[in-house]
A protein has these predicted regions:
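Reverse-transcriptase-like RNA-dependent polymerase core
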Residues: 48-69, 82, 163-177
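Short Gly/Ser/Thr- and Asp/Glu-enriched loop/turn motifs at secondary-structure junctions
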Residues: 60, 216-220, 252-253
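Non-catalytic, polymerase-adjacent accessory regions of viral genome-replication enzymes
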Residues: 1-44, 361-364
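Conserved polymerase palm-domain catalytic core
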Residues: 42, 49, 118-219, 224-242, ...
């Protein structure tokens, strides 16, 4: 059966598999648990509605989050998420991703933030071998990427690449859930795929016409490394024009050309190339400050009995695991000491002792 076959998207088997994928990490939600407990019946009903043409997507629930920065979120129902996941995995993503450049790293199998960071390290090592540690970085950020995404541009891109029956399904979802001429919200995989696809032509322009060899993009955060500042100025001008042609503007506060020696802020870390060619990856100071503030709040709540100690440990462990991906040995030692100090003498075991006690012992 062809990957883009309609049946490969809306069959019971495809939707049931999608349900299992969608429930990971969210089974604690009542709506998800209810659907999952009646999974066979609910999935059969969903498949029947899609086959008969009676399926209608429900309006997303919209809300705003404030951390780490204010952002509007649209959350779709679990039922709609199951369908969209199947449509994405079995039809949209396999087709749209065929033309992606290698250095487009968001929301793809085998890619992600870790892969993007490793690629930037590789670029810096490659640059040092050819040019040394002096150079320039052109770093770009698009103002209001998802809110300003053109519906016409997005639909044209999908229509160009997808089979007619698949495009019809995609267009129906987009039109039912998003009104007006611009603006999407990354509350579903389909919109995330739109997010990494809408700049596909732009990526090829940068790589093939501007000949930017050390170019990397993660959604709307992208950069070029070069030894030629004038070349980067020209790139910026031409790239800005290309983006304007599809309805985007650069965020001028975050878009700049600067010396490589200043270090590169990218995906939560600051990358520095030393004069010996070593690449250092350090977590941003503001991230550390934000985590310390969060820990103070969580520990206070735990001491009042509002949340269990284990939940606070889990939260810190998540941040610690993220920070440990960089050159953070000394920082982590200081953070461990700070975290333990928040609990005080009332807690006999420190974080490391609690953490070690949970590790399985070796046999023998």
């Amino acid at each position: 059966m062809e990957t883009n076959s309609l049946e490969n998207v809306i069959s019971f088997e495809a939707l049931y598999d999608s349900m299992h994928k969608c429930r990971k990490g969210v089974l604690w939600k009542d709506s998800v648990a209810s659907f999952y407990m009646n999974g066979i019946e609910r999935t059969m009903k969903l498949s029947d509605e899609l086959h008969s043409g009676t399926y209608k997507a429900r309006k997303p629930v919209r809300f705003t989050i404030t951390s780490p920065k204010p952002r509007d979120i649209a959350s779709i129902t679990f039922r709609d998420r199951v369908y969209q996941r199947s449509l994405n995995d079995n039809a949209v993503y396999p087709t749209m991703s065929k033309s992606f450049i290698y250095d487009n790293f968001a929301c793809q199998k085998g890619k992600g933030t870790d892969a993007a960071r490793n690629r930037l390290k590789e670029f810096l090592h490659r640059y040092y071998r050819k040019h040394g540690h002096d150079g320039y970085v052109a770093q770009f950020d698009i103002h209001g990427y998802y809110p300003n995404m053109s519906h016409a541009v997005t639909e044209d891109l999908f229509q160009e690449k997808l089979p007619a029956e698949v495009f019809s399904m995609v267009k129906t979802i987009l039109n039912e859930q998003y009104e007006g001429d611009t603006g999407y919200n990354p509350g579903s995989q389909l919109i995330q795929i739109a997010g990494i696809s809408v700049l596909d032509r732009f990526d090829h322009f940068v790589k093939e016409q501007l000949h930017a060899k050390l170019y990397i993009r993660y959604m709307d955060d992208f950069l070029i490394i070069s030894d030629d500042k004038e070349y980067l100025e020209t790139c910026k001008e031409l790239m800005e024009a290309q983006l304007a042609s599809i309805g985007f503007e650069l965020n001028q506060k975050k878009t700049r050309i600067y010396p490589l020696k200043d270090g590169i802020d990218f995906l939560g870390f600051k990358f520095s190339l030393t004069n010996t060619g070593k690449v250092l990856m350090m977590i941003r100071p503001e991230n550390v400050k934000r985590e310390r503030k969060k820990l103070r709040r969580l520990v206070t709540k735990s001491k009042r009995g509002e949340i269990p100690l284990e939940k606070v440990d889990e939260s810190y462990a998540t941040w610690r695991n993220h920070a440990s991906k960089g050159n953070s040995h000394n920082l982590l030692q200081r953070m461990d000491a700070y975290y333990n100090s928040l609990w005080g003498e009332d807690y006999a075991d420190n974080y490391q002792q609690r953490h070690e006690s949970k590790r399985p012992r070796k046999a023998g």
